[in-house]
Amino acid sequence: MTRKSKEFRMVGVNDVRDINQTVFLHLIRERQPISRADIAKFTGLRPGTVSAIVNRLIKNGLVYEGTEGPSSGGRPPTYLYINSESFYVLAIDIGVIDTVFAVSDFNGRILQQRSVLTEGEPDVFLNGLADQIDSLVKSQFSRARFAAVGVSVPGLIDRETGSIVSSPNLEWNDVPVRSVLETRLRLPVYVENDANAAAFSELWYGPIDEASVRTLLFVLVVEGLGTGLIINGELRVGSRFGLGGFGHMSIDPNGELCSCGRRGCWETFASERATVERFHRVTAKQGLPVLGIQELIARANKGDEMALESLKITAEYLGEGIANLVHGIYPEAVVVGGNITAAWPIIEPIIRKRIHS
């Protein structure tokens, strides 16, 4: 068997400079306010090298200096901060029911947000979405200030092409998301699985201390169920097509048919869809209207026994699946996201008990 040879190239001075600038931006974002001396301590670089890179970041408008920060008296030290207004980013979250798109600054603060229904053929939908984004940008922002577009979608992603390989819940296959949106928006487009994007966002912008928590499991409970994994502070995405969806690990080979074509996937027991369907199997006999997950949770919070029971069963299955992953991955933190967290006081004790049992 022959093995395909890898391509190598020499790393030049410009490559090293770009890498160092990226490292500095990440460090400043994570620990701002931070001094040049602290950057030198963290990176092991000489003070002169640190100052040269920092000055370049300041010149490019990505970082600014200030004196608001910890001081031990005397002349206040100079600290570095991310310039949140240096550029904007477009964020798009394509969901099964609706799609949310937003404009954020360099610090991740959302400036504008809109939502549209996810409907129609993929190409028609993406072009219509681009029209709405264009309208928002033209009315309130300068296009020159935008750096890139980030897109999160449920399903299997080809990161090299920015295409959706397969999204059973969306019923999209081989959809060239990057190609369509780059052509229309004239910006670089990056496509990622929704659970992976959520895990990365939690690490960067959530309440978790990034410096102390280096391994994190994110469980995204939406129409389907996805997982994102951070190990040693880095998103683990596996091969070109992803690490694999733990939401499609089978916990009952004789269970219900999943949208992926297999039976008894974790998703068929613990997703929003599973929770709602469980509720309706009981209430349909009583002639109650079909509810979404938010309405179901509202009923549960008011004491509706059938809604409570449906959520509690979901919590049992969530806890069971998370326990299996925890015992194999040993994350320092587990985060659950999605609409179902509106029922957190109901489901959290059950999930926790299941994990620790």
Where are these regions (language model features)?
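Phosphate-binding/catalytic loop of phosphoryl-transfer enzymes
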Residues: I92, A148-S152, L156-A274
